[in-house]
């Protein structure tokens, strides 16, 4: 089955049938459920879909200030690992996509339930990759300094162009959020090397702050990590630049 076949077209753009008599109703039927919704990267995606008018729900192990904020913004969040806690509106595989973080174990009860019932299940990095299609992507990678640098890029973009969006790996003091939504195609993204997530991005501008030995539980050797960064640089779009 093609990834996001019921929601995205081949360019990764939102599929909303133009001949539908009720386009808004159809749009609202696209629900997103997050496993690990309280994570800094996951919550930014959740906020994006809330802004888009989607129904959003999810699970996290621990209630936090961030999950409280997401709930206040409209998400339904629970903290008990139990498929019975999944809201009824998110129990239909025809209308719900499940996004999970690599931190969620393979034997997680809710993840197993979604798999057993035929849901479309994608990693956070996959969803971010799809959402970045059609954008001018400024991706910041590196074993240290990603969040600070991405926030600087987002702030400069905002101040210079008056627009642009960003998915941040921290709560920016300037924006008071980990999500920035603005006009135009420019998108600043924190490109995480953990689990090779950044290889889901095809940037126009790629920034690498550092490539020190890290996440060796994933890569095995420092050389393998450096090779992944080289692959990331190799995915720069034609006419793009690396910094």
Question: Which residues does each PLM region occupy?
Answer:
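N-terminal leader/targeting and accessory segments in enzymes
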Residues: 2-123, 127
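Phosphate-binding loop of NTP-binding sites
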Residues: 14, 24-25, 48, 71, ...
């Amino acid at each position: 089955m093609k990834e996001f076949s019921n929601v995205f077209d081949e360019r990764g753009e939102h599929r909303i049938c133009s001949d539908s008599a009720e386009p808004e109703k159809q749009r609202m039927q696209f629900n997103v459920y997050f496993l690990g919704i309280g994570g800094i990267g996951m919550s930014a995606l959740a906020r994006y879909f809330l802004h888009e008018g989607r129904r959003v729900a999810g699970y996290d192990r621990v209630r936090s200030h961030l999950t409280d904020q997401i709930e206040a913004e409209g998400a339904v969040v629970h903290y008990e690992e139990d498929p019975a806690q999944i809201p009824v509106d998110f129990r239909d595989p025809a209308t719900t996509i499940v996004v999970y973080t690599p931190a969620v174990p393979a034997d997680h009860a809710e993840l197993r339930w979604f798999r057993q019932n035929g849901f479309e299940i994608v990693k956070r990095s996959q969803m971010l990759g799809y959402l970045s299609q059609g954008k001018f992507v400024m991706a910041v990678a590196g074993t240290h300094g990603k969040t600070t640098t991405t926030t600087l890029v987002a702030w400069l973009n905002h101040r210079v162009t008056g627009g642009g969006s960003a998915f941040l790996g921290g709560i920016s003091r300037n924006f008071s959020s980990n999500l920035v939504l603005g006009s135009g195609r420019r998108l600043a993204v924190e490109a995480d090397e953990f689990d090779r997530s950044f290889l889901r991005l095809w940037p126009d501008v790629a920034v690498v702050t550092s490539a020190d030995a890290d996440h060796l539980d994933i890569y095995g050797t420092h050389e393998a990590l450096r090779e992944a960064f080289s692959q990331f640089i190799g995915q720069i779009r034609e006419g793009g630049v690396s910094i």
